[in-house]
């Protein structure tokens, strides 16, 4: 009981560290000693530019830190995420045209609660960027699963909800790992009013058939440009 209280306190402290920015499964460093993973870029670098193709299926992001620059490519055609050409194994990107259309309808006052993760209607003024999914690596308990998600999920306020879901599974000793899926939304890209948020769902299986708890929508978080 004492051990559980200690772990709970550690987790509570970890969830107050600040916003959780978009990122992915960290595997690039296995392929390169100099190229950071997508997760590391999101945590320690700033976005300098973002380019989205006309059909939405190719997203190119440039991250910078000092004189260091790295390029991320999210490809909805082959579902890969790459950093400087190195594939981020375990992290997938897809562009759901139906989700994009629903966002446009919502911005035109369509009354619908339907979209990829089934959490809530898209927030007015935001547009759908894409859906990222991945795997948190095998973990011994809910704390390690939650900590492995730091840097993965964009937006604010998801931590306590994730903890509630994961601790309930930990109590039943049912979480060797966890799969996640989130829809990314943004508005004001490349401006001083650039915000992003996500709708998130955990799963027990890679096929995303066995849901872990209910999905939720994070609170929008501001994206700071390098000179801001």
Curated annotation (Swiss-Prot):
Signal peptide: 1-28
Keywords from the UniProt entry: Signal
Stated name of the protein: SPbeta prophage-derived uncharacterized protein YomL
